[in-house]
Amino acid sequence: MSNNYIHPDSIIGKDTTLEPFSYIDADVEIGNNCWIGNNVTIYSGARIGDNVRIFPGAVISSIPQDLKFGGEKTTVTIGNNSTIREYVTISRGTEDKMTTSIGENCLIMAYSHIAHDCIIGLSLIHI
């Protein structure tokens, strides 16, 4: 018994580890060799690259904190080799086909919030 919820329409890459009590929604893509810590929530629209580490309590691709959001199909992308530390929240884009993007080789430090429609470049540290 895994104690995880993994929607059958999600895509999880080879050699990716999901620790207990994580939630993976529909329309989620997680790359190869990732590590998803316990109590991580990944909502619809997440596109996660290879070799990404997401630490306990993080919430990825939550609906944006924007009153004009009307349920459009939007995404969050996290580039290869990035690390998302404990209790980070990342909101997806606001308008149709918009995205919140974190580049490759980034470190998003604990308790950070990445708001809707933000673009974080390559190899950056967000405090």
How would you name each of these model-derived features?
Residues S2, H7-P8, G13-K14, E19-P20, ...:
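Left-handed beta-helix
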